[in-house]
Amino acid sequence: MRQQTYRVMVLLVVLMGWSVATIAADTPDAHAEDRKQLLQIFSEIENGINEQNIERMVAQMDENATVIWLNAEASRGHADIKAYYKRMVGTGDAILKKYMTKAKVAAPARFMGDIAVADGTMEDEFVPIKRDAFKMNSNWSVTCAKLNGKWKIVHLHLSANVFNNSLLDEVKQMVWYAAAGGLLAGLVLMFGIGRLMRGKRAD
């Protein structure tokens, strides 16, 4: 009797779980249209970066938006954001010829009324003017606000692992090369001094 009761209870739990899952699957996403707009913004930002088109990027941002760049520098407002980008990417005294990325969304955006938050990862490639190109993985997070019926970026944060990245690996490699070079130079110097001392003794 107890075994039969247990089976009935298990069956009821399974049926209830199936019913809840079915209802959840049939419930329409209240933010479906918002998600489409946010993905369009995401695409425009990514394409703007890869085309070196700061105007295309800024068009997705509120006029008072803040961007925290990979070097931890902050830009506030369209003019400041454009000035930073042109100082870093381009020609003349710029640091980079170009900057490209392949971005991914980590999870669906979270909504709090007319505010949406999302985050993800980026596979970046930098082409400096004065050195070889290098790649680095980074992370991004964004806060968007629905203003006058349209979604705009109000805060964009870019970050990278400062303790483990390709630039640090390169520095470590250079340290090893320098150490090996110093050791070799020391051995050569000791060999030369040894020969000189032996020559003096022979005299």
Language-model region placement:
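A mature extracytoplasmic/lumenal domain signature
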Residues: 61, 71, 121-124, 140, ...
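Short, well-ordered alpha-helical segments enriched in acidic and aromatic residues
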Residues: 51-69, 76
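Short beta-strand edge/turn micro-motifs at domain boundaries
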Residues: 27, 137-168
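Short, low-complexity N-terminal intrinsically disordered segments enriched in polar/charged residues
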Residues: 22-59, 171-182, 190-195, 199-203
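Surface-exposed, charged secondary-structure patches
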Residues: 26-27, 37, 70, 79-132
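Bacterial N-terminal signal peptides that target proteins for export
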Residues: 1-10
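Bacterial N-terminal signal peptides
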Residues: 9-19
